[in-house]
Amino acid sequence: MELNLEPLNLPGVESKRPLVIAGPCSAETEEQVMETALQLAKNGVKVVRAGIWKPRTKPGGFEGHGAKALPWLKRVKEETGMLTTTEVATAKHVEAALEAGIDILWIGARTSANPFAVQDIADALKGVDIPVLVKNPINPDLELWVGALERVNGAGVKRIAAIHRGFSSYDKKIYRNLPMWQIPIELSRRIPNLPMICDPSHIGGRRDLIAPLCQQAMAVGMDGLMIESHCNPDNACSDANQQVSPDILDYILNMLVIRDEIQTTE
């Protein structure tokens, strides 16, 4: 199935590499969300992310505040002019996010691995013109990733991008999720006009890996970066080890070397 795609065309965001999406793993408090967003905006970030509903691996962890936190992102948009994005995993999430004026939605790795869940989300998006970002499934299955993209596009959503966040593996010697760069590269070969965004936070799982992973993503031609950033990362309620402060993020972005010629990973 050939995808019918249009450019993301994000208002107020220049169409240059890399598109940067940054913000906390979880929306913990209104103050934390606002403080992080204000610092990111000061450094030129135009799109803020925050997890509202958190699909945790095991019960008992911080699972987010749910719809209660959506007004916090609305306030961010009103006070900073930033675009907002959050993860949706059900049709109810989609409806709540749209009602709150969220600008961009993303489908997480656990959800994209489930065709039934993706189809429910796609059905909820019919008739809605909103950018949707689709993370790779947790397992290294290119066809499953393509299938999720096709389901969303089949609902009439044309502004779509893919997010590469690595793949689950029992071997976690270096990375939290193995990058397996050949898979997103093959996806880009198959669908050349599909924007590709790298999530180095979930690939690396550690702050010290974010900078080199960002550079690798640029070297293989990815269009954007989704990076977890927190105003006080050491005290984050979730994924503290992979979040960086807005100032450290700014340093990482300023150190990137962006070339027109794309390198391979061979």
Regions of interest found by a model, annotated:
Residues 19-24, 46-50, 84-86, 105-107, ...:
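Hydrophobic faces of well-ordered beta-strands that scaffold small-molecule active sites
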Residues 62-86, 121-131, 181-196, 242-264:
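Alpha-helix-loop-beta-strand connector modules within alpha/beta enzyme cores
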Residues 13, 117-232:
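Catalytic alpha/beta core domains of metabolic enzymes, predominantly
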Residues 35-52, 100:
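Catalytic domains of carbohydrate-active enzymes, especially glycoside hydrolases
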Residues 49-68, 230-240:
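Glycine-rich, proline-tolerant flexible connector loops at the mouths of alpha/beta enzymes
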Residues 18-35, 59-61, 83-88, 108-109, ...:
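Active-site mouth loops of central-metabolism enzymes
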